[in-house]
Curated annotation (Swiss-Prot):
Keywords: Protein transport, Transport
Superkingdom as given in the UniProt entry: Eukaryota
The protein's assembly and partners: Interacts with clathrin. Interacts with MYO6.
Pfam (any one): GAT
Disordered as annotated region, ranges: 164-219, 466-507
Name used for this protein in its record: TOM1-like protein 2
Protein family according to the UniProt entry: Belongs to the TOM1 family.
Function: Acts as a MYO6/Myosin VI adapter protein that targets myosin VI to endocytic structures. May also play a role in recruiting clathrin to endosomes. May regulate growth factor-induced mitogenic signaling.
Molecular function GO terms recorded: clathrin binding; phosphatidylinositol binding; ubiquitin binding
Lineage: Eukaryota, Metazoa, Chordata, Craniata, Vertebrata
GO biological process entries: protein transport; signal transduction
Gene3D superfamilies reported for this sequence: 1.20.58.160, 1.25.40.90
């Protein structure tokens, strides 16, 4: 295609675009940009030649410095050229085939390039939505939104409108400028520091300055004063930019935020005066400096607006978070006297306040403390005496039926009771007659043992004879293979065994 149509940079407007988008430029050449707009408006093939040159510079270019300069030229031309150029720009082939391809993920462009392209598409879609022959960009914009592409937030009311003004640099005889009134020039330059501020929005980069009056020229002294004042503006822009870089939205200090807002108001007032001078000063060098300062102001204003949006959004999130925390704490309502309903403010109070709050809780009559206090209190000493008395009486009743063969066991039991009494020590017995009852019981057992005599040898022989006769009447049984015959149990021993079992059952 290039072979048939020739080099896009060979045309007059193509040469200007090649120079204006050269990557070696330190900043935008606004004089050259406005000259490109004039050529497009005045020549028949200007719009087509300009689009060919811009496509060549944008298509597949990985030098994003040149891409940003080309996008600035494109934006300037759209705002300063007519319908013929708009038709070329809003065509679907250019928007989808060139601009959208620049921000594709495979090219991995910088964020500033992505934001610039998306902002241009969004602004053009909004401006040309009502024009039937310029809706190609509108369709691309809607498709990108359906795909989930997030466009940067932009205050469309604060941006300059897309229109085609008259020629920005009128053709005036240079000799006419020499006859300009000195009073008019002095009043023009004094506007930078003495004019009152008005609430007019700032213009976007590349926006056309309004025509306020006729062109004026200034002497070296006035230019020096103007440049010194521009240095002050640059200093304010630098301070504001550094503050925006250092500050975090939602975490800024009150004094820093107040200073930043003051700088924003001051810089906006200065920009209004700069925009007024851009259209009236005929010195190209001064005009270029004014345009550069205006562009810096626009950039820092965009950063400030983004900072404010993030700050307000963060503060709104924090407010919603606090409200939701309070709501969650009060979900369970246990009544006005419930200790579970504690607000977040009470959690950080001093321990004394917490103690006073706990002390003021209303405890009902059915609580555990009231129930325990209502129980009858007994002396532990009385409880032990009652237990000892019960054990003593039951033991005395059981001992009445027990017989002993060995009189020495009597002394052992008495000594054991004495030891038990010594171990109990300082616990007094409620009734002093208990020990007397035990002694009486032991004396009765002793008398019973004395009356009971052992088995005599005659009785034992008689018992053996009876057993032998009984054994003769019983049929013979096979004797066990080993072991001795069982010994007959003595009736006295059987009695002792039965008494021991009774004692165990009683215990």
């Amino acid at each position: 295609m290039e072979f048939l149509l020739g080099n896009p940079y060979s045309t007059p407007v193509g040469q200007c675009i090649e120079k204006a988008t050269d990557g070696s430029l330190q900043s935008e050449d606004w004089t050259l940009n406005m000259e490109i707009c004039d050529i497009i408006n005045e020549t028949e093939e200007g719009p087509k030649d300009a689009m060919r040159a811009l496509k060549k510079r944008l298509n597949g270019n990985r030098n994003y410095r040149e891409v940003m300069l080309a996008l600035t030229v494109l934006e300037t031309c759209v705002k300063n050229c007519g319908h013929r150029f708009h038709v070329q720009v809003t065509h679907r082939d250019f928007i989808d085939g060139i601009l959208v391809k620049i921000i594709s993920p495979k090219n991995n462009p910088p964020t500033i390039v992505q934001d610039k392209v998306l902002a241009l598409i969004q602004a053009w879609a909004d401006a040309f939505r009502s024009s039937p022959d310029l809706t190609g960009v509108v369709h691309i914009y809607e498709e990108l939104k359906r795909k989930g592409i997030e466009f940067p937030m932009a205050d469309l009311d604060a941006l300059s409108p897309i229109h085609t003004p008259q020629r920005s640099v009128p053709e005036v005889d240079p000799a006419t400028n020499m006859h300009t009134s000195q009073t008019q020039k002095r009043d023009s330059f004094s506007n930078l520091s003495n004019s009152k501020s008005t609430s007019t929005p700032y213009t976007a980069p590349g926006g056309p300055p309004p025509n306020v009056g006729g062109p004026i020229s200034a002497n070296s002294e006035q230019i020096g004063r103007l440049r010194s004042e521009l240095d002050i503006v640059r200093g304010n822009v630098k301070v504001m930019s550094e503050m925006l870089t250092e500050m975090t939205p939602g975490q800024e200090g009150a004094s820093d935020l107040e200073l930043l807002q003051d700088l924003n108001r001051t810089c906006r007032t200065m920009q209004e005066r700069i925009v007024e001078l851009i259209s009236r000063v005929s010195n190209e060098e001064v005009t270029e400096e004014l345009l550069h300062v205006n562009d810096d102001l626009n950039n820092v204003f965009l950063r400030y607006e983004r900072f404010e949006r993030y700050r307000l959004g963060r503060s709104a999130q924090n407010t919603n978070g606090v409200l939701s925390d309070v709501t969650e704490d009060n979900l369970i309502d246990l009544g006005p006297g419930s200790p579970a309903v504690v607000s977040p403010m009470l959690a950080n109070t001093a321990p004394s306040n917490l103690s006073s709050q706990l002390g003021g809780l209303d405890v009902g009559t059915n609580s555990v403390s009231s129930t325990l206090s209502a129980l009858p209190t007994t002396n532990p000493k009385d409880d032990f005496d009652m237990f000892a008395h019960t054990r003593t009486n039951s033991l005395a009743d059981q001992r009445k039926n027990v017989t002993y063969e060995d009189p020495q066991a009597l002394g052992g039991l008495v000594s054991a009771l004495d030891v038990r009494k010594q171990n109990i020590g300082g616990i007094p017995v409620s009734q002093p007659s208990d020990m007397d009852d035990i002694e009486d019981w032991l004396s009765k057992d002793l008398k019973g043992d004395e009356l009971e005599e052992g088995v005599t040898s005659e009785e034992f022989d008689k018992f053996l004879e009876e057993r032998a006769k009984a054994a003769e009447r019983v049929p013979d049984l096979p004797s066990p293979p080993t072991g001795e015959p069982a010994q007959p149990m003595n009736p006295a021993g059987r009695k002792k065994q039965e008494s021991s079992e009774d004692k165990l059952f009683a215990l």
